[in-house]
Amino acid sequence: LEAARQAMDSAGSRQTVAQGKLTLSVPKAVGRFVIHPLMMAFFHRYPQVDVCLRLEDRPLDFIDDGIDLALRITDTPSPGLHGKPLMPIRHVICATEAYLQQHGTPYTPQDLRAHSCISLGETPADARWKFRREGKTETVPTYGRYAANHTAVRLDAVRQHLGIGSLPLFTAREALANGDIVQVLPEWEFISSYSGDLWLLWAGDKHMPARMRAMIDYLSETVPALNAGSTEPAK
């Protein structure tokens, strides 16, 4: 089957028009907030390409899983894969103006001890928030009545004034721009163990079908542009 697929891809690589089905695996939150909003324009640009978007957070085998391209957040891509970083993944902490008016605005990381903080909640370490500013690092144990391991859920909880939540910037960006939420402690960099670069990965450069090259070029153009003019956390 793999030999047949390679033969088809080899034929596809000689085609100048991008066409056929492409399977793209992405982390769930990245798929929802970054990639899915870009797909409509891709379909207009490449009307003969069909896309299967898989939202999944698990290790991949490109051949066994039938994956053409994958996006993963990492600083160390798997050996043997080809790829390129598209954008850095930063995290911020946010709240609504209404929450801050009722409970006060934190001015230092230690002030968070007096607040309800919405964390990832997968391990105890997720409630120990770490910050950096001008070479100084502070770690604060936080408490909150609610934790959730999905970014969309945490964003919704923040919007409902449940507390101060940790969010990837790509999740919070639209709500920040609309004024639905505000960044807390913007002078401090929030250090998350889930940060890194968003890498676009593929198994090999040989006999690359035109549809794969089209998606690589499209994501290389559109994803980095998402950071242009956005509110980045302090470095």
Feature map (PLM): residue ranges:
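A local structural motif
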Residues: 48-52, 136-145
